[in-house]
Each structure stands twice: as C-alpha cells, then as structure tokens.
C-alpha cells in the first residue's frame, strides 16, 4: 500500500479535561531464547527405524566434526509418555531439529516430543529447524499421502484432544521452512548445510560469548531503559563515545538480546569505512546504502532500489530492530533511517557514532554516552585477555595493575595489550614494562604500535598489506594476491588474530578502524616528506603529488586511490609516472559503489611504462585506448578496467597464466580481446555493455577453468565461437540483451556443468541448439524477450534438473514441445506475453510446478485437462488471455492452488462448478471479465478465500450470496463498477476485518446497502449512495460534526462507525491520505485512520465511504473534522457525514458489540498535548459502561 492512508480526524476537546493523565505503557516482552541457560546446544527428534543408520549417523558425525554435541534420546527407556528427563532435555536445548520422515507419525513418542518442541518454540523462544527426509512437507502439513496413512493408524483409539494436539504440532512444524532431502542432489551437502546453520545460530548467542565483556550488563540495561520496548511508538536512540570504547560490542550484545522480539533485524556495520564521504554522486551513494540495508533486513541479495522511497515501502508495516554502526554523516542516516515513519510500530533504530552533533542534527533525543571503564573494570578487561579470567593470577597482581595503568582505560588498548602478554612469564612481562613506559605516552596509538613492534618482519609486512590494501578481502582472495610472498598466509593471519590485530569471521578479514589507522600511520612515517618512498600510498594528496611529479620509487608496491576523494580539479599523470615504480604490485584507481563520476585521471602525453610485477590492475575510466606497449601481464591475478576508453588491452599474445578475474565492463569502444591461450586459471570474465565487441576469440576455449562468463548488453555480438564447448567447468553464462546474436554453436551442449543460462533480450535469436539437452546440470533458463524464437528444441525435455524456465514476451513462440512433460523438477514456468502461443502441451508429469505464468497469451484458447496433475501448483496467472473460452473442470482438483488471476479474460463466460474443491484457494481475481454473468454458488464454501475481485465485470448480474448465510472470514470483496450487479445479500459477516467495495454499483438494492452499513462486523466498505443513512446517530452537513457524550464515559475507549459522502475531490490519485500522527492545536490532537488498500483509489462522488475507528474519550464534547489528504495536500472535501457509536471499555475488554476490542490492538492513534492518552488509560481505574 502507498505510504499514505485514508483520512485524518482532527479532534478538539472542550470543557472537561482530566489533568492527571500520566503514566507509561508496559507489557510483557515475548520470550527470547537469549534469556535461557541452555543445557544442550541441540535436541534431535527422529523416528529411529527411518534415519538411525543413515541420515542420523551422518548428522552426528558432521556435528562432531564441528564441535556440536546434540542430545539424542537413544539410551532412554520409552514408555507410554515422555518422562521428566526427556522433557528437561527438550526444554533445555537451544535448538530443536525435527527429522520428519515417512514413519515419524507412527510413533506416539515422536509426536509427544513434537508437541513439546513446538510449545518450547512458542514459550521459550527455542529455535526449531526441520528436515523433511524423503517426505513431502505438504503431506506432513495436511497429514496426507503415505505419511498421513501412518499417522492415522497411530490416532486410532486416542483421545480427540491428543490427536488435535498432534495435528496442530505437525502443521506448525511443516510450516517452518526447512531442508527437503528431495531437493538435494547430494545428501552430504545437505548435512553440511544443516551443520552450518546450527553453527550460525549457536555462534549468535550472547549467553557465554559475551561473558568477558566487563560491565556489559550495565550498559545494556541503561540502553534498554532508553529504548522503552513496551511502547508501540517508533524510537531512535544514539550510542555515542570515542573510537575503541566498545560501542560496537555493546550494540551487538544488545542486538543479540533483543532481536527475537522483532519481525526483522539487521546490523549495518563499518558504515564510515565502507561508505566514505564526500562523493560526487550523493544520490547513488544513498541508493547503495539503502540497498545494503534492505538486502540484510529482508535477506535478499539482489535487491533493486530504484529510488529512496523503497525502504519506507518495504518496512513501514514491519517491526524492525536496526543497528547502524560507525555512522559519520547525515547522508548515511538519510538513506537508511531518515524518519521514524519508515518503520512499523514498535521498531527501534540504534545509531552508533563518535559524533554527538550528528545525532542531534538528526533529531535523536535519546542518547547514551559510553564512558571509560573505572580502574577496577579496566583491570578486569585486561585480565580477561591476559589470563582468561577477571582477576590476575597469583604473583601477577601488582604488575597487572602497572600494565593496566600504562595501557590506559580504552577497552581496545586493554584488549590488545592483554592479548600480547597472554601466556608470557612474569619475567617476560617485566622486560616489556620499560619499553612500554617509553613508547606509550598515554597515547592509544603507541599501545597498538607496541603490539605491532613485537611481530616478526613477515607478520609486520602482512599487517601493512592488509591495513593499506586488503582489509575488506576474503582470506582466499588475499592468498591469491600474496601467493609469491614467503610468509605462510594462514599462519600469519592466525598470529595477527591471536594478538587482536585483526579478526577472522566466516572467511572474512576484519580490522578495527584504529588498527587500520595505525597501519596507515606506520607507512606514512616511512617517509613523511617524500611519499614516493613509502610502501603504500592511500592519501589522495600524496598520490597526486607522486603521479604528477614523477617522484615514485622502487620502494612503492601499492597505490590505492579512491577517485571520489579528488574534490576539485583533475590529476594529469606524467607519461613516466610509473617508470621508477619497478616493484609496483597493486594499483587501484576506483570509484566507490559504482559512482560513475566525471573523468579525473588524465594522461595527456600517454603512458610509457607500468610495472611488469603488477598482480592487481584496477583502473576504472582508463583514458587511453591501450595499455603501454611494453606492458607484461605475466603476474596479473586480477584486471578491472571498467568504463574505460580501451579498444584493446595490449598488442601481441602476452601470457596471462596467473589471471583469475577480468572485468572490462562498460568499455564501449572495446573491439578486441586478448589471446586466452594461456588463461587456464581464469575463473570470471565480465564484459557487460561492451557495445563494439563483435566476437570472442576462439582461444576462449582454452580458459577451461572459467566459471562465469558475463556478456550482458554486448549488442554487437553476432556469434559465439565453437570453442565455447570446451568450457566444461562453466556454471553461469549471461547473454542478456545480446540483440545481434542469431544462434548458439552446436558445441554448446558440451558445456555440461552449466547451471544458469540467460538469453533474455536476444531479440535476433532464431533457435536454441538441440544440444542443450546434453546439459544435464542446467537448472535455470531465462529467454525473456527472444521475439524471433519460434520454437524450443524437443531435447529440452532431457534437462530434467531444470527448475526455472522463463520465456516471457517470446512473441513468435507458437508452441512448446511435448517433451516438456519430462521436466519433473520444474518449479517455475513463465510464458506470459507469448502472443502466438495457441496451446500448452500436456504437463501431467510436471508434478513440482509451483508457479505458471500465462498472462497476455492472447491466442491461448484452452488449458490442458492434465493440469490437475500439477498438484504443487499454487499460483496461476492467466491475465489478458482474451481468447480463453473456458477453464478445464479439473482445475479445481489442484488442491494446493492458492492464487488464480483471470483479469481481462473477456471471452470467459463462466467458471467450472465444484470450485469448493480448491480448498486452499485464497485469492481469485476476475477483474474485467466482461462476459462473466455469475459466480458458482459453491465459491462461498472456500473457507480460506480472502480476496475476490470481480470489479469491472460489466455483465455480472449475481454473486450467488443469498443461499450462503456466512461468507469466508477476512474476505476482501471488490465488486466496484459492476454496473449490472443486482444483488440481494442475505448473509452474515463474522470477521471484523472484512472489506467490501461496491463502488458505482448503482443497481445494488437498498436491502443490501442497509445490511452492509448496519452489520457491526463490516468495518470497511464503499457503496453507492446520495445521503447519509438514518442509522448514524450523529449526522451533519458541512465540514465538522460535534459529538456530545455523558461525562461518565470519560477515559473510555469508544469505537465509532463513520459514513462520509464526498462533495468534491481530485480523482487522479490512486492512493490518498496522510501517514502521520502529529499534534495540531494546543488543545487538540490528530487521530490517524488507515483503511484497507483495496478501498483506496480515485476519489468518488455519489458513493458512501464507511469505516470504523477507535479513540479514548477525554472530553464530554468534541468536534470531528474529516478530510482527504495526500502528503499533506488536501485532495477532497466531505460535505455530509455521520457517526455511530459502538460502546467499549478497557478494564475488562467487554463491549455491547462482539466485534469491539481494545483500540490499541488496531491503531496507536491517540496523542494529546504530546502525551499518549493510552499511558493514562492503562493505569487509571475504568468505570463500567453500565454505571
């Protein structure tokens, strides 16, 4: 729904006012697994006869390899019910893993375990994981199939209450997304994945991990009080303090303790380092920040964020916990948390920074300052790292205090010094004291450098490489770049980690900002006044000086220039700038996060030389057409020259045997690629948007270790060489929008490791070679927009591992081969926009198909009767199939079908009967089915139906509601603009969330209109009308209405039903209102109402808008004003309206209407003089409504 809402009511209070309204809302927090003291890491629930000798033993072995000891009830004597020892084991396990196998339901013991596990999940926050072993999750969920047969036998003779508990537990367990063994080619890989998931959960536990953080509990307690988690408002707080004080640690501990109480959560760390400022394109920077936020928050890697409103759209109704760590600019906050309105009720945003002014500038009122620890706490912190306990070992008491004093109170310095002295003798400590005294001078940099000085030369060199060039790389990447160094990479990294100079996390190298600064300062001091004599250059001014004045030397091995740091002017690089840098190995001129700013680096006289020892060449927007003539790429590991003026890389056939990664994307003038004869180690080749590239060299076939080839938008590429068939290790091939590509070579079928093929937008492609059937590992094929493609090869049926096949807008495709019925693993088939497609083949064997898209297949006249065999199909799109005459009656036999879209099927006259067989159908859309006359009466028997859209069905006469006294719960019925609809409604709406839209249905009879208005459960509706019905107690003409109530109802929660008639308005806005709760007048407050999105649309005259809202009465007389807004701009005026009161009171949650309930469960809507009236309500005794 749009970020706006429907109406704003302004309420002015007169006369009576309660002046003693002040309190605070409190509620019990949901259970969190983080608050438990777990006895076991993992509890395994399983049916022994199915898994003990196979799956279970392999899981145990993998767990043992990873140091995980699960609780398994092998040794327990089993009786009629699970005993106290097993109950204790279940309740005392942090994670429960349920191995659901075919005979799991045959054991009462297993079923009782399952009930207890699901109870612990609900009450204790226990993490529950599921593994479906040779069993369909749907069979478990619905107790059907072989699983259901076994389960039913177990239920025979059991009490009904027990059976219902078992069923509920099985359904709940099956709804947990778990591993399905049938989806894994290799069971061992599945078990490794399970073990990793368990390890991740166990490693994300603060119960023991944070014991060494002295004073952490005091910090988190203070911050939790600022967060006020019991309030439903959205709140931002700041954590402020100097670098190295422990802000990041505190925020992580806090996040770990609280994240289970929120729907979504994320920690965005190192923001200052990863997204530095300033930059030339601030908007692109904001988009990238927001993409990072959403990718982590909703766990979707390839998020598309086209504008800065996406975060609000995706998160406005989600309760989130967000930690933004190391923020140093308002731009960063504007991109990720500009306003509390971006997030759903109850959300908490924690901003961690060193800049107090930044917090205040962003309007953050609640700020926690992290102070230095006391002397005793500092000693404890030091001892935790030096001795592994909070006090000194015997005999080390005095010397430990001395070192603590010298190291200062900064936690980072205490950690580094403690790690350095760990396991040293007292004599070694004593020898270190004099050096420490002379080098520290109360400066944390000296403390850190003291630890650095203790390293061997090789480890020092590795430390400087990382701080200056590789601090955000993965370990294996660093190993490749430094392969020629004599140091043992893994051993060196471990030494640095042991001394707390870096950390190794899931294969990534992480380093504290102060340690990075230490390394940069060490390098800077190698030659303060002559930067060309240093090992590394990272400072913009220093680099400019060296490149323009030819002052580089053989000492220099790395240059890293972030071009966004060049704020003014350009850099004119001398022709001989690199001539003296004969040992240069790493050269990086780059723009941050794709910021394609103006040209900054120029070579007016060209370039005569680049070091032959280069291992990394990363030069974006390189201004010349070729690299220097004498350039030798023999040692190159990675070359990235995106967005450059290159026409070719170099002359001749140079050896590139060490090359692993090549990226020449957006080199629009590139006509020639280098010879790949020696590129046997090349793994990735990216050539995106190389518009002048006509062909690939035949030598590409020698790159036999190539894993990914990306040729997106190479619009001049006519063909691929036949040698492409030699790339037997290729896994991904992207040819998107290669609009000149006519065909693929017949040798293409030899690329047998290929898993993903993207041909989308290859508008000239005439055919796909039949040899594609040989690629047995192929899982995804995308050929959207291949408008010249007439048919698919019949061999496509041999790709039995195919899961996704997209042929969207293949307008010439007339039919699909019958062999497609062999694609038994196919899950997603998209044929939308295939205008020439007349019919589908039998898809009876495609039993795993979940989504079928056939929208705008305007020539399609029928569906195959065998569609009923696609038993897992849950979504079917047939929108715009204007020639579709009928649906096969078998369609309702697809019991898993949840969504069916038939919008614009203008030839469809009726739906098949027996629609009630589609028991899981939730959404049925028939909008603009102009030939449809009536709905089958049995449609109202589908209890799960939640959305039915028959709007603009101009011929629809009857909904067949009369014979069905109860419609499905929570139904949204949209019958707007059904101009022929003549409907009697003789039914009862049970659920208060029902939404009805009969806008412009002017033939709707008066009985039906009265029933909709007067049914207490129907809270949201639009229906035709010219006056406000007499049902509404308070009615008025004008722009306001005064409500008078007896004083005894003060501080009661009242539900109001309103009816509004629009006298004028703008109808161009599809969504309108204002998503804001804000104080207006000193004496008044605003109440916000958000209706269903299905009632939003153009503002309509001659129609009545009815809805309900709730508020707390604080005065015996008040005025209501109604208006329609969009982003604070008035769009319409309501001239006639009425209000009817439904009584409620808060003390016992009772009412005269069964639909009425305490208002805060629906809306946080009451604000008065800056105070939340609800606070007072909860602590003020309520008079009974009947007094």
Swiss-Prot record:
Q: Which Gene3D superfamilies match?
A: Helical domain of apoptotic protease-activating factors (1.10.8.430), P-loop containing nucleotide triphosphate hydrolases (3.40.50.300), Ribonuclease Inhibitor (3.80.10.10), Toll/interleukin-1 receptor homology (TIR) domain (3.40.50.10140)
Keywords of the record, alphabetical order, are: ATP-binding, Hydrolase, Leucine-rich repeat, NAD, Nucleotide-binding, Plant defense, Repeat
Q: What are the LRR repeat spans here? A: 498-522, 611-633, 635-658, 660-679, 680-703, 704-727, 728-750, 752-775, 799-823, 824-849, 870-894, 895-918, 920-942, 953-974
Q: Which GO terms describe its biological process?
A: defense response to bacterium; signal transduction
So what EC number does this one have?
3.2.2.6
Q: InterPro entries of this UniProt entry? A: Apaf_helical, C-JID, Disease_R_plants, Leu-rich_rpt_3, LRR_dom_sf, NB-ARC, P-loop_NTPase, TIR_dom
* GO MF term list: ADP binding; ATP binding; NAD+ nucleosidase activity, cyclic ADP-ribose generating
Could you tell me what reaction this enzyme catalyses?
NAD(+) + H2O = ADP-D-ribose + nicotinamide + H(+)
Superkingdom of the source? Eukaryota
Q: What class of enzyme is it?
A: hydrolase
Query: Which residues are in the NB-ARC domain?
Result: 217-478
Please name the catalytic residues of this protein: 113
Pfam families in the record: C-JID, LRR_3, NB-ARC, TIR, WHD_ROQ1
Asked whether the keyword Hydrolase is assigned, the reply is yes
Listed SMART domains: TIR
Please indicate if the UniProt record lists Repeat as a keyword. Answer: yes
Boundaries of every TIR domain copy: 38-202
Q: What is known of its domains?
A: The TIR domain mediates NAD(+) hydrolase (NADase) activity. Self-association of TIR domains is required for NADase activity.
Main role? TIR-NB-LRR receptor-like protein that contributes to disease resistance induced by the Pseudomonas syringae type III effector AvrB. Acts additively with RPM1 to generate a full disease resistance response to P.syringae expressing this type III effector.
Protein name per UniProt:
Disease resistance protein TAO1
Q: Which organism is it from?
A: Arabidopsis thaliana (Mouse-ear cress)
Instruction: Give the gene symbol.
Output: TAO1
């Amino acid at each position: 729904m749009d970020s706006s809402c429907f109406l704003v009511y302004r309420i002015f209070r007169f006369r009576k006012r309660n002046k003693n309204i002040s309190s605070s809302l409190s509620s019990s927090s949901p259970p969190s697994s983080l608050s438990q003291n777990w006895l076991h890491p993992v509890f395994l629930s399983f049916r022994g006869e199915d898994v003990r000798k196979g799956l279970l033993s392999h899981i145990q072995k993998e767990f043992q390899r990873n140091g995980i000891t699960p609780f398994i009830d092998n040794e327990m004597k089993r009786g009629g019910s699970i005993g106290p020892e097993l109950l204790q084991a279940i309740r005392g396990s942090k994670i429960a893993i349920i191995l659901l196998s075919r005979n799991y339901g045959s054991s009462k013991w297993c079923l009782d375990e399952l009930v207890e596990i699901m109870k612990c999940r609900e009450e204790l926050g226990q993490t529950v994981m599921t593994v479906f072993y040779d069993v369909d999750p749907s069979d478990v969920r619905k107790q059907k199939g072989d699983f259901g047969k076994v389960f039913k036998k177990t239920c025979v003779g059991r009490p009904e209450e027990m059976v219902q508990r078992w069923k509920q537990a099985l359904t709940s367990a099956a709804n947990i997304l778990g591993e399905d063994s049938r989806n894994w080619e290799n069971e061992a890989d599945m078990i490794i994945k399970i073990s990793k998931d368990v390890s991740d959960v166990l490693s994300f536990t603060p119960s023991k991990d944070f014991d060494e953080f002295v004073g952490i509990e005091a910090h988190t307690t203070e911050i939790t009080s600022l967060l006020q988690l019991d309030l439903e408002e959205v709140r931002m707080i700041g954590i402020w303090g100097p670098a190295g004080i422990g802000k990041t640690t505190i925020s992580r501990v806090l996040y770990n303790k609280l994240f289970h109480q929120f729907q979504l959560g994320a920690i965005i760390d190192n923001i200052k380092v990863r997204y530095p400022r300033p930059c030339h394109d601030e908007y692109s920077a904001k988009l990238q920040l927001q993409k990072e936020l959403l990718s982590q928050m909703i766990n979707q890697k390839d998020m598309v964020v086209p504008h800065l409103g996406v975060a609000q759209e995706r998160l406005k109704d989600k309760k989130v916990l967000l930690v933004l760590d190391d923020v140093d600019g308002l731009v960063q906050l504007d991109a990720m948390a500009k306003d509390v309105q971006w997030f759903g009720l109850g959300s908490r945003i924690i901003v961690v920074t060193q800049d107090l002014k930044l917090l205040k500038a962003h309007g953050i009122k609640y700020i926690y300052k992290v102070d230095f620890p006391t002397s005793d706490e500092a000693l404890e912190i030091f001892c935790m790292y030096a001795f592994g306990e909070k006090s000194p070992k015997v005999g080390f008491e005095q010397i430990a205090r001395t070192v603590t004093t010298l190291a200062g109170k900064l936690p980072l310095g205490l950690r580094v010094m403690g790690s350095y002295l760990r396991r040293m003798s007292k004599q070694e400590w004593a020898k270190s004291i004099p050096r420490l005294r002379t080098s520290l001078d109360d400066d944390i940099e000296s403390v850190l450098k003291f630890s650095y000085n203790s390293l061997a030369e090789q480890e020092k060199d590795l430390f400087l490489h990382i701080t200056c060039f590789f601090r955000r790389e993965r370990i294996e990447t660093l190993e490749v770049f430094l392969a020629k160094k004599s140091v043992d990479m893994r051993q060196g990294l471990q030494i640095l980690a042991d001394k707390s100079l870096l950390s190794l996390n899931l294969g990534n190298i992480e380093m504290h900002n102060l340690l990075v600064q230490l390394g940069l300062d060490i390098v800077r001091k190698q030659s303060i006044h002559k930067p060309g004599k240093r090992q590394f250059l990272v400072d913009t001014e220093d680099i400019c000086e060296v490149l323009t004045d030819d002052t580089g030397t053989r000492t220099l091995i790395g240059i890293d220039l972030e071009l966004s740091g060049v704020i003014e002017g350009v850099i004119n690089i001398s022709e001989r700038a690199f001539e003296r840098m004969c040992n240069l190995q790493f050269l990086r001129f780059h723009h941050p996060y794709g910021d394609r700013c103006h040209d900054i680096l120029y070579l007016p006289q060209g370039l005569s030389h680049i070091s032959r020892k280069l291992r990394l060449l990363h030069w974006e927007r390189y201004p010349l057409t070729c690299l220097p003539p004498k350039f030798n790429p023999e040692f190159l590991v990675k070359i990235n020259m995106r967005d450059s003026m290159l026409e070719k890389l170099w002359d001749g056939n140079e050896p590139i045997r060490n090359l692993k990664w090549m990226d020449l994307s957006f080199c629009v003038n590139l006509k020639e690629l280098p010879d790949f004869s020696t590129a046997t180690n090349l793994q990735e080749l990216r050539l995106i948007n190389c518009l002048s590239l006509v062909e690939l060299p035949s030598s590409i076939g020698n790159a036999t270790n190539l894993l990914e080839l990306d040729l997106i938008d190479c619009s001049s590429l006519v063909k691929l060489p036949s040698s492409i068939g030699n790339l037997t290790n290729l896994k991904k091939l992207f040819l998107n929008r290669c609009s000149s590509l006519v065909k693929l070579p017949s040798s293409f079928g030899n690329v047998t490791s290929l898993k993903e093929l993207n041909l989308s937008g290859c508008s000239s492609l005439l055919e796909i070679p039949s040899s594609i059937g040989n690629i047995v590992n192929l899982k995804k094929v995308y050929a959207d927009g291949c408008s010249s493609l007439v048919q698919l090869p019949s061999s496509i049926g041999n790709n039995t591992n195919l899961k996704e096949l997209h042929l969207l807008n293949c307008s010439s495709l007339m039919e699909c081969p019958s062999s497609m019925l062999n694609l038994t693993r196919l899950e997603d088939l998209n044929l939308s926009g295939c205008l020439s497609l007349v019919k589908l083949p039998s898809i009876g064997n495609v039993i795993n198909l979940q989504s079928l898209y056939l929208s705008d297949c305007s020539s399609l006249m029928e569906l195959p009767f065998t569609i009923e065999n696609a038993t897992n199909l849950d979504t079917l799109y047939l929108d715009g199939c204007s020639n579709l005459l009928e649906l096969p009656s078998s369609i309702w036999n697809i019991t898993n079908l949840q969504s069916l879209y038939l919008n614009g099927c203008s030839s469809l006259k009726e739906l098949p009967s027996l629609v009630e067989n589609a028991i899981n159908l939730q959404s049925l859309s028939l909008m603009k089915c102009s030939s449809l006359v009536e709905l089958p009466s049995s449609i109202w028997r589908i209890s799960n139906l939640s959305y039915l859209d028959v709007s603009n069905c101009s011929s629809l006469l009857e909904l067949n509601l009369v014979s069905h006294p109860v419609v499905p719960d929570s139904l949204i019925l949209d019958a707007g603009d059904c101009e022929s609809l003549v409907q009697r409604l003789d039914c009862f709406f049970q659920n208060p969330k029902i939404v009805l839209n009969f806008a412009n249905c002017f033939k709707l009879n008066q009985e039906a209109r009265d029933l909709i208005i007067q049914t207490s459960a129907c809270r949201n509706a639009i229906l035709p009308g010219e006056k406000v019905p007499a049902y509404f107690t308070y009615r008025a003409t004008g722009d306001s209405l005064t409500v008078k109530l007896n004083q005894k109802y003060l501080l009661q929660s009242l539900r109001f039903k309103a009816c509004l008639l629009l006298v004028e308005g703008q109808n161009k806005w599809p969504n309108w209102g204002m998503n804001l709760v804000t104080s207006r007048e000193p004496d008044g407050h605003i109440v916000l109402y958000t209706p269903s999105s299905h009632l939003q649309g153009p503002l309509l005259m001659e129609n009545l808008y009815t809805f309900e809202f709730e508020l707390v009465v604080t005065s015996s007389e008040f005025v209501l004003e109604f208006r329609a807004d969009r982003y604070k701009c008035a769009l319409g005026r309501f001239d006639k309206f009425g209000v009817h009161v439904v009584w409620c009171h808060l003390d016992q949650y009772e009412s005269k209407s069964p639909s009425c309930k305490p208002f805060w469960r629906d809306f946080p809507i009451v604000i008065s003089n800056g105070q939340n009236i609800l606070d007072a309500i909860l602590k003020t005794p309520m008079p009974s409504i009947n007094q």
